[in-house]
Amino acid sequence: MAPSGGQEAQICDSETFGDSDFVVVANRLPVDLERLPDGSTTWKRSPGGLVTALEPVLRRRRGAWVGWPGVNDDGAEPDLHVLDGPIIQDELELHPVRLSTTDIAQYYEGFSNATLWPLYHDVIVKPLYHREWWDRYVDVNQRFAEAASRAAAHGATVWVQDYQLQLVPKMLRMLRPDLTIGFFLHIPFPPVELFMQMPWRTEIIQGLLGADLVGFHLPGGAQNFLILSRRLVGTDTSRGTVGVRSRFGAAVLGSRTIRVGAFPISVDSGALDHAARDRNIRRRAREIRTELGNPRKILLGVDRLDYTKGIDVRLKAFSELLAEGRVKRDDTVVVQLATPSRERVESYQTLRNDIERQVGHINGEYGEVGHPVVHYLHRPAPRDELIAFFVASDVMLVTPLRDGMNLVAKEYVACRSDLGGALVLSEFTGAAAELRHAYLVNPHDLEGVKDGIEEALNQTEEAGRRRMRSLRRQVLAHDVDRWAQSFLDALAGAHPRGQG
């Protein structure tokens, strides 16, 4: 079990600091501790865009990463002593935060993913509010703050990531006023009237105001935060509009000025572009088309299995296009890759059952023996296999009901150096603000989604190349390194030491 808060606070109040000038604080470490069949443990690299985005910055700046190592720690397994202190893994300094089964159930599956996640995604599923979940969220956030405090050198920069850790900035500010603290939210920040439903709304805003810079994907999220800061905490806030990577908002709290900005995250587009040109990837893409029966058109969906992603919307649209004869069943297929997600949360279990029932219905109605019209895989795909699917597909379907950014859309574009393919993209993704030459659709308008898919399937080669060239220009110019650098530059200017 993790030490009590009192013990850790004593450590943090001492005059000893860590030696890391730059600290990332995230729910997960960039590696997971895995138990092997013989009972021993090993570290395995975590997939994910956050690791890709921040690892180069960590390496350049003598960085450390604070996060959960991916195993539940209930104090019964003595071989988890490896988690007792900092770990050097592939030349990165890692500081594990130990979480018990109860912590995961209440802080992560409970408050983070059954309260905050649905609230921040426009209440597609009703948020659940439980006092014990909130209490655990506070407790775990305190442990993350204390771990960050121990890792950070005097005057270091600490970058806190995402909705699971919204109380950490204030907690860390109280422990270590010498630090420069940034926070970035990777999911949408909700409209004011929705956020006001939250019983602990003031505490969340106060937690975020502990940062020197609070970042969102879009200007709208930044504006909502400024309004709530003024209404709930009484900050004196700027009244002008917030721009993208410019025209920052400000909230004045006592003697401190908190900068608020919009920083749309991106992907490592150069690396994806390079990988997609690889001869082996190209060969695998051709094999995929052969394995699918060499259809004329392949539509692709790649998502975590989440109710925000609109998987059911695209399947229903495809089913109706088949029924209406606007798409031919013998030359068009859908491939849906659905990565398992939060499988112990009831709403996710229900979603999986619903999607698999929907796939079965479509294949039963329109497929043939040995030739389904929907190919559905409920498992993660290795990176190279995923890139091959991007290269092989003719239309990428990205239809979330709400999404902070959606990096899959940008990954697809980065992989299409051949200027082939088409992107059908929900207006309710952050990416839609940048990828204006996609086929933009409203996922709540089924007829509009059907029209968008049909238009993408039937585009001329010239029109498709023109659209994809424009999309690639945007994605290749605004990559993940530019995102991280723009945030950190703004953070350096936000702290009093950088103002002068």
From Swiss-Prot:
Its EC number is 2.4.1.15, 2.4.1.347. Activity is increased about twofold by 10 mM manganese. ADP, at 10 mM concentration, inhibits the formation of trehalose-P by 70% with either UDP-glucose or GDP-glucose as substrate, but GDP, also at 10 mM, only inhibits the reaction with UDP-glucose (50%) but not with GDP-glucose. UDP-alpha-D-glucose binds at residues 48-49, 304, 309, 407-411. One of its GO terms (cellular component) is peptidoglycan-based cell wall. Transmembrane segments: none annotated. It catalyses: ADP-alpha-D-glucose + D-glucose 6-phosphate = alpha,alpha-trehalose 6-phosphate + ADP + H(+); CDP-alpha-D-glucose + D-glucose 6-phosphate = alpha,alpha-trehalose 6-phosphate + CDP + H(+); GDP-alpha-D-glucose + D-glucose 6-phosphate = alpha,alpha-trehalose 6-phosphate + GDP + H(+); TDP-alpha-D-glucose + D-glucose 6-phosphate = 5-methyl-UDP + alpha,alpha-trehalose 6-phosphate + H(+). Pathway: Glycan biosynthesis; trehalose biosynthesis. The record marks 117, 187 as: Involved in alpha anomer selectivity. One of its GO terms (biological process) is trehalose biosynthetic process. Keywords: Glycosyltransferase, Transferase. It comes from the Bacteria. Involved in the production of glycogen and alpha-glucan via the TreS-Pep2 branch involved in the biosynthesis of maltose-1-phosphate (M1P), and probably in the osmoprotection via the biosynthesis of trehalose. Catalyzes the transfer of glucose from UDP-glucose (UDP-Glc) to D-glucose 6-phosphate (Glc-6-P) to form trehalose-6-phosphate. Is specific for the glucosyl acceptor (Glc-6-P cannot be replaced by either mannose-6-P, fructose-6-P or glucosamine-6-P), but any of the glucose sugar nucleotides can be used as glucosyl donors. Homotetramer. PANTHER family: BCDNA.GH08860, TREHALOSE-6-PHOSPHATE SYNTHASE. Belongs to the glycosyltransferase 20 family. This is Trehalose-6-phosphate synthase. It comes from Mycobacterium tuberculosis (strain ATCC 25618 / H37Rv). The lineage of its organism: Bacteria, Bacillati, Actinomycetota, Actinomycetes, Mycobacteriales.
